[in-house]
Curated annotation (Swiss-Prot):
The keyword Cell membrane applies. Its EC number is 1.3.5.2. It is a peripheral membrane protein. FMN binds at A62, G63, M64, D65, K66, T86, N139, N172, K217, T245, G268, G297, Y318, S319. Its cofactor is FMN. PROSITE patterns: DHODEHASE_1, DHODEHASE_2. Catalyzes the conversion of dihydroorotate to orotate with quinone as electron acceptor. It comes from the Bacteria. This is Dihydroorotate dehydrogenase (quinone). The active site is at S175. It holds the Pfam family DHO_dh. Binds 1 FMN per subunit.
Amino acid sequence: MFYKIAQKFMFQMDPELAHNFAIGSLKFTGNSPLNCFYAQNIKPAPVTMMGLTFPNPVGLAAGMDKEGECIDAFHAMGFGHIEVGTVTPRPQPGNEQPRCFRLKPAKAIINRMGFNNKGVDNLVANLKAVKSNAMVGVNIGKNKDTPVEQGKEDYLICMDKVYPYAAYIAVNISSPNTPGLRSLQYGDLLDDLLGSLKQKQKELAEQHGKYVPIALKIAPDLSSEEIEKIADALIRSEFDAAIATNTTLTRDGVSGLLNANEAGGLSGKPLNSLSTMVIKQLADCLKGQLPIIGVGGINSAEDALDKLDAGAEMVQIYSGFIYQGPKLIKDIVEAYRIK
């Protein structure tokens, strides 16, 4: 009920303004009695994945809490894990505004944010301040002005800094809004990146006395052959997991709608079937050697179960969460428990 009222108010605002207002409110209330407006008691439905035990299979996808300011608030809502970021080594403003658009009739969003964030040091300070025992994944990326050929250095810098505070680290090479980034999904660039990250993980595990798993986040706009090659590279490098998928450049299901022709990545309901198809293809190629976190267009418990049936072990929500509110977390966990 409270969410429906809040949503009505925020949907009158510009999407980015509404996002910033929501983040500010959650940051302010996360550890106060005011969190009663959104806190939920969700009975545990544990999932063991990447050597970690999560309280339930529903996570918050990266992009919502870029700076890790609201981890305690999202934990109070009942998320099994919270993925913060994408974070880059240095602060950057992202692309010019407006850069985020609602497509309400399709329950979709188009964004071309461009990894706007205050830099990895700011994120680390926020991670240190977390009071809850939330499972936090950190999604890392490269700065826009770092050449793609040197991109791996940015990932290594971020990994080094967030390692002690992360439950797992997600490597984002699939945002469509950083020029050239998706080229890291192919061939020698991918092999070199995965190999370097695994080597760094080994060094950091010795240094900190704990093993923090690393997952690769991939795009939905891949051919069967490309998915097969990525799966092969993940297996060869002994990566810990895959996250499928990021936003799409396709516009299926939204043609003719206001804002449908805006540049950027499309998320929300129209992405659902495409991302589930990619999960299925990826799972077939991985043959159980790596677990998958399924994300993209989940708008109901049924959508989440479809992704689990396709081969994912956990799911993440973002656009569906904006349109449905915290109730979606509870719905998915309950459906998972019955299943």
